[in-house]
Amino acid sequence: MIQVETRLNVADNSGAKLVECIKVIGGSKRRYAGIGDIIVVAVKEALPTSVIKKGTVEKAVIVRVSKEYRRPDGTYIRFDDNACVIVDDNKNPKGKRIFGPVARELRDHDFMKIVSLAPEVL
């Protein structure tokens, strides 16, 4: 459950390390975002040599949330942190590598490139 002002780790090598959610995409009254949802983020920490600089505004997809998520088969999944991957307008990741596990629900939201780059899909 990600809302405005939530800080997330970045799970790719785009150069950003920490971002803050500034908008949940999908309606003016939408408050929360979950796994597979696109949010607008502001970069709070970035590597000095990266293309993405501190203070820039990007779009990102959520790949891990620490709040447990109930799947249709009745099982629950929960991660240790909140993490996202910075994407472009065509749902392709800006980085070339993904760090850490990602949720299987990304496959249902058509983020196949992220799923194929991830070292583990849970």
Curated annotation (Swiss-Prot):
SMART domains listed in its UniProt record: Ribosomal_L14
PROSITE patterns attached to this UniProt entry: RIBOSOMAL_L14
An example molecular function term from Gene Ontology annotations: structural constituent of ribosome
Record-linked InterPro entries: Ribosomal_uL14 (IPR000218), Ribosomal_uL14_bac-type (IPR005745), Ribosomal_uL14_CS (IPR019972), Ribosomal_uL14_sf (IPR036853)
Gene3D superfamilies the record matches: Ribosomal protein L14
Key words, A-Z: Ribonucleoprotein, Ribosomal protein, RNA-binding, rRNA-binding
GO cellular component: cytosolic large ribosomal subunit
SUPFAM superfamilies for the chain: Ribosomal protein L14
Pfam families in UniProt: Ribosomal_L14
Gene Ontology biological process terms in this record: translation
Subunit relationships: Part of the 50S ribosomal subunit. Forms a cluster with proteins L3 and L19. In the 70S ribosome, L14 and L19 interact and together make contacts with the 16S rRNA in bridges B5 and B8.
Summary of the function given for this chain in its UniProt record: Binds to 23S rRNA. Forms part of two intersubunit bridges in the 70S ribosome.
Family membership: Belongs to the universal ribosomal protein uL14 family.
Protein name: Large ribosomal subunit protein uL14
Protein source organism: Treponema denticola (strain ATCC 35405 / DSM 14222 / CIP 103919 / JCM 8153 / KCTC 15104)
Source lineage: Bacteria, Pseudomonadati, Spirochaetota, Spirochaetia, Spirochaetales
GN (gene name): rplN
